[in-house]
Amino acid sequence: MLVGRSAEKLKATRERLSNFENVTEFVADATDEAATKAAVEATIEAFGGVDILVANAGTEGNLAPIESLTMREFESVLRTNVIGVWLSMKYCVEPMKKRGNGSIIAISSIAGMIGSPTMAPYIASKHAVFGLVKTAALELAASGIRVNAIGPGPIDNRMIRSLESQFNPEDAAAAHDFIVSKIPMQRYGTNEEVANLALFLAGDESTYCTGSIYMIDGGWIAA
């Protein structure tokens, strides 16, 4: 089950997965409790239950000093990055308990391990996700449900291009080069690399893994 706000993007993703059977989509905003509950109910109706949750909704928000941020800007990032993850967990836990097992994977960020000027809402939200994951892992371990987080570094996708243009509006390419210079592996990661880590955490190869944060950052945090 693919869940997201954009029907057009969901359709495009489903078409990319045309080689797989039983791929369907449900339009819902992760910050909308009723819509999230409905998405989980639709999943149960279509597949008989919930085995795996990948909480992947996220936004970078606008970059600004703390004193310049508006309440709306700060709340918007936290609603998507924290409330969205929590709501997805909230409505997937009971179906997983009924099956006696499950794997919850929250896509967070290296931002949950560091500070960064002008990124207060994003940094705060990703620290919160790590705390939520650790707490949920402790609550749910006895029910056979594993909860882990993935902490990507810079990944070659829309979000990093948005950040590049905000870091240096006059020369996004220079921002790109500066960010890459901070990565020991000297490149951005790919969506596929993050997906492969999620597959590991979703599968039987990781049945003793819970409450952990898996960095995929080209060595950024180690540097």
Language model features with spans:
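Substrate-binding pocket helix/loop in short-chain dehydrogenase/reductase
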Residues: 64-66, 70-75, 179
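C-terminal substrate-recognition "lid" of short-chain dehydrogenase/reductases
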Residues: 86-89, 187-216, 221
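Conserved glycine-rich Rossmann-like NAD(P)H-binding loop of the short-chain dehydrogenase/reductase
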Residues: 1-12
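Short, small/polar-rich loop/turn modules that mediate ligand/substrate recognition or access, typified
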Residues: 141, 146, 209-211
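Residue(s) in the substrate-gating loop at a strand-loop-helix junction
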Residues: 109
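Short, flexible catalytic-loop segment of classical short-chain dehydrogenase/reductase
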Residues: 130, 147, 152-166
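Active-site helix of classical SDR
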Residues: 89, 125, 133
